[in-house]
């Protein structure tokens, strides 16, 4: 499949895909994720259409906590919703992340991973913000470079819908978010072709609606609460296969070999580095260099 090439950074690539699958964006800017929300806001103001033929409604709140609340509420009424954040901003979203995951609401948080400030402010990239969210119930997908952000972000959106699980889609702050590369760009028709429309309709059918009312945010005692928490394990057990399914759809369209894990290096290697994020490009170059030297 031939795709057009454009020079862009990781933030732009993520925003390009997010806009396609989004009906509402709840935003609040924080470095280094701000350009994603900025692009979505600009495209919405210009009347750009998503794959559903509508313009994204952008709601800027007073804080990241407010943005997360907007995402939660918007999902509850059946609108496909996205947000963009990092660092302390992501930490402010954690209370709503528990609720979003617990209610099996499909959405994507695009995160340009950044250091969580402690004894001092640090705006540069690491995974401390992402790791703080591991037990929220969000699935996590990580990309290495801007091309991977473009290629794999649709996997997060589509797998979230089919797997009924919210995704934290992340890449390294500045190192990937602001790295400009000449990459191949998705056409929205191809993104629409991958979208599980039956899952979209099912999501909308379960939205809060006065014509078929349902209760949300109920109170449960320990006996029932535990059973319900255990019941969701089947959703998470099935999720890796769903992610792999959409990675294979991407591979079929692009001729790539994306998988849940990709091995790179000699088949008889005695030591293995397990890594994710922008470091992978460096590791591959080192492997090539050492292999060439024998």
Question: Predicted regions: what is each one?
Answer:
Residues 1-132, 137, 154, 173-174:
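Thiamine diphosphate
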Residues 52-56, 167-262:
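Conformationally flexible catalytic loops at phosphate/diphosphate-handling active centers
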Residues 114-115, 171-178, 277-279:
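Glycine-rich beta-alpha junction loops
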